[in-house]
Amino acid sequence: MLAAMGSLAAALWAVVHPRTLLLGTVAFLLAADFLKRRRPKNYPPGPWRLPFLGNFFLVDFEQSHLEVQLFVKKYGNLFSLELGDISAVLITGLPLIKEALIHMDQNFGNRPVTPMREHIFKKNGLIMSSGQAWKEQRRFTLTALRNFGLGKKSLEERIQEEAQHLTEAIKEENGQPFDPHFKINNAVSNIICSITFGERFEYQDSWFQQLLKLLDEVTYLEASKTCQLYNVFPWIMKFLPGPHQTLFSNWKKLKLFVSHMIDKHRKDWNPAETRDFIDAYLKEMSKHTGNPTSSFHEENLICSTLDLFFAGTETTSTTLRWALLYMALYPEIQEKVQAEIDRVIGQGQQPSTAARESMPYTNAVIHEVQRMGNIIPLNVPREVTVDTTLAGYHLPKGTMILTNLTALHRDPTEWATPDTFNPDHFLENGQFKKREAFMPFSIGKRACLGEQLARTELFIFFTSLMQKFTFRPPNNEKLSLKFRMGITISPVSHRLCAVPQV
């Protein structure tokens, strides 16, 4: 009898046990996920979330900056999103953005380190570092940039020289259709190369071209849905093939390139004669030898150099590409820019920032390109450093903060014609007018440290190109303002005709 009952129990257990175990495991995981993601009291509202994934499939990563505007309309100027384990809050509107990034900047000063960023950079570099390490790296880099000409005539002359190389390269196209992408990338990148590596590269240099292509590819890949899925399930995705593996491989190659440049510098390094950023950093590292807590170490040198290289190339070159595209699409605006250049500079003199004050229209056009180009649409993310209250909502420590620059730069209460390319937004009585709602370089203590360099580059490169060429659409080709979503928003691949000025 007992044997029969035992056999029956064993048979029932064999049938029930796997299912019960599976259901119990799923129920436990769902309960754990629910408790983990339970919103605290007064947390900003947001859309309904799926277990484990959060709002991942509600976001179209090909146009995420536009998708979130629908949530703004539904949930207001402070709303939340969950992307896997990442809790994010989007801030919209000038008053709230200023409150967070200026008046409460000490509470929003860190950078969030996603699983993808952790894999690539950990907490090193200039862009994604936080706390004392970030303060030390930023202070050192600003000093180094000033020592190598930032804000001085020497660096401006370097930009003018590179602008000549760029105009010569474009002149070789003989007015025929060409894609300006990598010619512009070459020129802009050479400025930061001269600062970091102490040398510029020829536009035909195959090694340099490969470097720029790797940089372009990581810019695009990092914002893709597959790569973002790595941030949700890193422990699974790291074993699977896909674009995220290409991304990691490309960053590894870029790091090897910088390591090679550092090794070259070490061979003939003279502490008494600092040639460039790498030399300056090696000198600073030598002061902290034997200090395990110092932020000045080789991995930070590699990551900081890559940050300078990326930020110093991608943002400015993308803005210039938008500028030429807008000029080809708005020939009447291009003519006004050229008329101002002819009047103030002429054809025989090289453009310089000394002429900027006398060229309000050209300056306004550059600013309008930045507004409409909107290349960093949700700003570089911040992270809440301590439990904080903003606009009556509770933001726990560790929450990712995104600032809605897309809505700000298209706000109808701030701009007369928000969806139209209109340089008059930056003009008043014929003079250039600064706008508080314009912040392509962000604001506060974590604003872009290369803003001054970028403004100089944009003005000199743009005016040099407008001085020498008229940009037009190729015959039988229609230009559009369609964009490619990546870390930045860039124009889709297109061709232009650069007709030399007579």
From Swiss-Prot:
Changing T143A: In allele CYP2J2*2; significantly reduced metabolism of both arachidonic acid and linoleic acid. It holds the Pfam family p450. It is a peripheral membrane protein. Gene3D superfamilies: Cytochrome P450. GO terms for biological process: epoxygenase P450 pathway; fatty acid metabolic process; icosanoid metabolic process; linoleic acid metabolic process; organic acid metabolic process; regulation of heart contraction; xenobiotic metabolic process. It catalyses: (5Z,8Z,11Z,14Z)-eicosatetraenoate + reduced [NADPH--hemoprotein reductase] + O2 = 5,6-epoxy-(8Z,11Z,14Z)-eicosatrienoate + oxidized [NADPH--hemoprotein reductase] + H2O + H(+); (5Z,8Z,11Z,14Z)-eicosatetraenoate + reduced [NADPH--hemoprotein reductase] + O2 = (8R,9S)-epoxy-(5Z,11Z,14Z)-eicosatrienoate + oxidized [NADPH--hemoprotein reductase] + H2O + H(+); (5Z,8Z,11Z,14Z)-eicosatetraenoate + reduced [NADPH--hemoprotein reductase] + O2 = (8S,9R)-epoxy-(5Z,11Z,14Z)-eicosatrienoate + oxidized [NADPH--hemoprotein reductase] + H2O + H(+); (5Z,8Z,11Z,14Z)-eicosatetraenoate + reduced [NADPH--hemoprotein reductase] + O2 = (11R,12S)-epoxy-(5Z,8Z,14Z)-eicosatrienoate + oxidized [NADPH--hemoprotein reductase] + H2O + H(+). Highly expressed in heart, present at lower levels in liver, kidney and skeletal muscle (at protein level). It is found in: Endoplasmic reticulum membrane; Microsome membrane. PROSITE patterns: CYTOCHROME_P450. The keyword NADP does not apply. Changing R158C: In allele CYP2J2*3; significantly reduced metabolism of both arachidonic acid and linoleic acid. SUPFAM superfamilies: Cytochrome P450. GO terms for cellular component: cytoplasm; endoplasmic reticulum membrane; extracellular exosome; intracellular membrane-bounded organelle. Heme binds at C448. Pathway: Lipid metabolism; arachidonate metabolism. It comes from the Eukaryota. Keywords: Endoplasmic reticulum, Fatty acid metabolism, Heme, Iron, Isomerase, Lipid metabolism, Membrane, Metal-binding, Microsome, Monooxygenase, Oxidoreductase. Belongs to the cytochrome P450 family. This is Cytochrome P450 2J2.
